[in-house]
Amino acid sequence: MTLSSGEPSAVGGRHRVVIIGSGFGGLNAAKALKRADVDITLISKTTTHLFQPLLYQVATGILSEGDIAPTTRLILRRQKNVRVLLGEVNAIDLKAQTVTSKLMDMTTVTPYDSLIVAAGAQQSYFGNDEFATFAPGMKTIDDALELRGRILGAFEAAEVSTDHAERERRLTFVVVGAGPTGVEVAGQIVELAERTLAGAFRTITPSECRVILLDAAPAVLPPMGPKLGLKAQRRLEKMDVEVQLNAMVTAVDYKGITIKEKDGGERRIECACKVWAAGVAASPLGKMIAEGSDGTEIDRAGRVIVEPDLTVKGHPNVFVVGDLMFVPGVPGVAQGAIQGARYATTVIKHMVKGNDDPANRKPFHYFNKGSMATISRHSAVAQVGKLEFAGYFAWLAWLVLHLVYLVGYRNRIAALFAWGISFMGRARGQMAITSQMIYARLVMTLMEQQAQGALAAAEQAEHAEQEAAG
């Protein structure tokens, strides 16, 4: 079934803006056009606006998924010039100026006058996608809930294990990737074990768990520089996190992981719970855009190499923002997406008023507001311009910044309350786990494989019938 979400603009009709994605770039673009004389269609494959920087707190039981992922439709319900569509974009026709999305068996074709592509990024396993079965990433709510099930489930399995080696394996946690997400996850697993779970088991001592932070790079938090990276590493090591650098993961399976050292030697770590926080790849829409335009290229991560005004070459009405765009010096962080969205919407407002000259647009300029990473309760590292600081005040700055960027007063109050319980005491309010959290991904993968197998068999049978008839 194919539906149309709008007709081509009549002469003098309202300008139609299509936004793909409901992350930082997509949501901020929609809100920035609130008072503009435009009709907006926001298309997203999820129903929520996800605050990704706090996913690790969902995985470690501090926050609920609702605290960091309010419903996009409800956020924008008072903005009457926005329509929200749930669906996965499977085609962008730059010549016809349409976006095709699919939800179940329904296909929707949405025309546009201006397009903002803010589809974000996904976890990258550097060509080893089979690792995902045993080492979930940290990009979606599903990822975070699965990891919560695996982390807490590892302690439960260790409690009933009677084999010493198996118990040690269950209590070994490996986090791959020493960027902000990896550092934060490793620190929170330690705090979960030492504070929240203290005294809750009878045959194991949770604080005796082994937490390993791995990275192929030679330093922790490379983008933040050697000084802050070293401070973060020392703090982690003080918490008994084993920081292992220059260590490349070459294999991941149910029992553990295999690592290749800098000198070429390999070693094995037996572990039950693996967290993949290393590397991102742009949405497949980047490749789709490049293939549909003349002269547009993508980089190795799949990001679109945009023009200075964030547009696709030859298409001054098509903007790419956030993790999907490649602009030298602009990191893949929330601020890059937000600033890119504001720039694109400013240009669109000029277009609507007839004041835009594509050949003379001011280029996008990124203002670096700094970066932060929390390590543990009362400890973080922060970089703001040339200023670098760590410890308690960096942690306070981290708290304030994340509260400001959470969408909605309800979510801010809920997060503040949960943080108060967790940081001033031991408790965490989101410790429930279910079998669905742990096994749903695997079951869905198996079902998809079975469906593909059935489809292939049907196609082969049809082909055989045609040959017999011909």
From Swiss-Prot:
Cofactor: FAD
Subcellular location: Cell inner membrane
Entry's Gene Ontology BP terms: biological process involved in interaction with host
Reaction equation(s) it catalyzes: a quinone + NADH + H(+) = a quinol + NAD(+); a menaquinone + NADH + H(+) = a menaquinol + NAD(+)
EC number of this enzyme: 1.6.5.9
TM helices/strands, residue ranges: 389-409
Keywords on record: Cell inner membrane, Cell membrane, FAD, Flavoprotein, Membrane, NAD, Oxidoreductase, Transmembrane, Transmembrane helix
Pfam families the record matches: Pyr_redox_2
Active-site residue numbers: 184
GO molecular function: NAD(P)H dehydrogenase (quinone) activity; NADH:ubiquinone reductase (non-electrogenic) activity; oxidoreductase activity
Membrane topology: Single-pass membrane protein
Cellular compartments per GO CC: cytosol; plasma membrane
InterPro entries: FAD/NAD-bd_sf, FAD/NAD-binding_dom, NDH-2
Top enzyme class: oxidoreductase
Disruption phenotype: Deletion of the gene does not affect virulence in mice. Deletion of the gene does not induce any major redox perturbation in M.tuberculosis. Non-essential, can be deleted without causing any adverse effects in vitro. The ndh-ndhA double knockout could not be obtained, suggesting that at least one type II NADH dehydrogenase is required for M.tuberculosis growth.
Textual note on the cofactor: Binds 1 FAD per subunit.
Residues annotated to bind FAD: 21-25, 89, 323, 334-335
General function of this protein: Alternative, nonproton pumping NADH:quinone oxidoreductase that delivers electrons to the respiratory chain by oxidation of NADH and reduction of quinones.
Family: Belongs to the NADH dehydrogenase family.
Protein name according to UniProt: Type II NADH:quinone oxidoreductase NdhA
